[in-house]
Swiss-Prot record:
InterPro entries per UniProt: Bacterial_rp_bL28 (IPR050096), Ribosomal_bL28 (IPR026569), Ribosomal_bL28/bL31-like_sf (IPR034704), Ribosomal_bL28_bact-type (IPR001383), Ribosomal_bL28_sf (IPR037147)
An example Gene Ontology molecular-function term: structural constituent of ribosome
Record-stated family: Belongs to the bacterial ribosomal protein bL28 family.
Keywords: Ribonucleoprotein, Ribosomal protein
Source organism of the structure: Ruminiclostridium cellulolyticum (strain ATCC 35319 / DSM 5812 / JCM 6584 / H10) (Clostridium cellulolyticum)
GO biological process, one term: translation
Database matches in HAMAP family: Ribosomal_bL28
Name of the protein this chain belongs to: Large ribosomal subunit protein bL28
GO cellular component: a single term: ribonucleoprotein complex
Keyword set includes Lipid metabolism: no
NCBIfam families for this protein: L28
Origin: domain of life: Bacteria
Length: 62
């Protein structure tokens, strides 16, 4: 499942609406990437959304 391990952003659910206001179910998925970070001095791999990645909420391992 696409879920950010930093902010817990996950798939959200709702409806698509046509011009006639017919409702069909749809999902919105977060833009999640798998990166390596430094956690307590050791590198580990996490799934993080691009919003958290851009705002430097984690230290990226190079």
């Amino acid at each position: 499942m696409a879920k950010c391990e930093v902010c817990s952003k996950a798939t959200s659910f709702g409806n698509s609406r046509s011009h006639a206001l017919n409702a069909t179910s749809r999902t919105w998925k977060p833009n999640v990437r798998k990166i390596k970070i430094i956690d307590n001095g050791t590198p580990r791999s996490i799934k993080i959304c691009t919003r958290c990645l851009r705002s430097n909420k984690v230290t990226r391992a190079i």
